[in-house]
Amino acid sequence: MHKDEDQRLLGAVPLPNDPDRSLRPQVLDDFIGQEAARANLKIFIEAAKARQEALDHVLFVGPPGLGKTTLSQIMAKELGVNFRSTSGPVIAKAGDLAALLTNLEERDVLFIDEIHRLSPAIEEILYPAMEDYQLDLIIGEGPAARSVKIDLAKFTLVAATTRLGLLTTPLRDRFGIPIRLNFYTIEELEYIVQRNARLFSVQISEDGAHEIARRARGTPRIAGRLLRRVCDFALVKRAKKIDRKIADEALSRLEVDHLGLDPLDRRYLLLIAQTFLGGPVGIETIAAALSEPRDAIEDIIEPYLLQQGFIQRTARGRILHQKAWSHLGLCAPASTQKHPQLFDMPDNASRQTVLWDEADD
């Protein structure tokens, strides 16, 4: 991930030593939002406990900051088992995975974040481990090489990914419980902000909590981060209570607008609007123009803009919707207004209406 993105206020990537970790709920009943996912998990956990068996493998899918890691930790607590955590890029060799799996006890939970970044070789070792609870390793090299099978404790693999499409079908099919997490509503985030304020021993009004919640991009992690910055502002201003005025002033200073867009989002939208006349424009071109890696744009910037209806992804590239033009205070080009079919162009459409076409996008 790009260095600047790691430090971005509205980035949903967890920061090192992030104090918001202390705000995480410890049981499912305290977890706010994701109602359908919580209800289903509660049933699956109770069933596994009643059978005294390991819970089926779980795959969480969704943008960063929605609670995938928190739910994994809660699952281990509810099951009364140990929790082990790692991430896809960390598991570089077969020995790394073997060390993790052989140290698991019966019914333990192993959490792998960013599982889509596992190498194909590691995936091949993971298949029998998930299905048969066995490790099939090759010891030695050349003619002296031999296959060794190691029995494992029956464990639960909980994996998280922001990019479901990058998972191979064999790996994806081995998860018995796939769960998609969605962006939170403003009401849910408002409740989270009020809860966090109580934990901080900070007084906040309903309209103050609402102001923070509506700028949090549907993401609890961002809501907690914004609340901390508003608390800093209120402390320096000697405000006894965070109200809408204090929250608005603080967030405006941080250049977070009323829909939760920050300078990087606006750079993205302005680039497509002003340089490429609303698109279509390929993701590689956008990444080069913004000096940001493609993954950061696809995983961090675009999901919220798509959910809010600012942009559309097409086979030809990214296109701005009317909502984006209005938010930027710009007029859409006449060609966009006259040809709405540009937003839903079939693959066999005339290439003359395409402004920028990139085969590699």
UniProtKB/Swiss-Prot annotation:
From the UniProt entry, list the residue stretches annotated as the region Small ATPAse domain (RuvB-S). Answer: 185-255
What is the purpose of this protein?
The RuvA-RuvB-RuvC complex processes Holliday junction (HJ) DNA during genetic recombination and DNA repair, while the RuvA-RuvB complex plays an important role in the rescue of blocked DNA replication forks via replication fork reversal (RFR). RuvA specifically binds to HJ cruciform DNA, conferring on it an open structure. The RuvB hexamer acts as an ATP-dependent pump, pulling dsDNA into and through the RuvAB complex. RuvB forms 2 homohexamers on either side of HJ DNA bound by 1 or 2 RuvA tetramers; 4 subunits per hexamer contact DNA at a time.
Instruction: Give the species this sequence originates from.
Output: Bartonella henselae (strain ATCC 49882 / DSM 28221 / CCUG 30454 / Houston 1)
Q: Which gene encodes it?
A: ruvB
Catalyzes what? ATP + H2O = ADP + phosphate + H(+)
Q: Which Pfam families match?
A: AAA_lid_4, RuvB_C, RuvB_N
- The record lists its disulfide bonds as none
Which protein are we looking at? Answer: Holliday junction branch migration complex subunit RuvB
Tagged with keyword Ligase? no
Task: State the residue spans of region: Large ATPase domain (RuvB-L).
Answer: 1-184
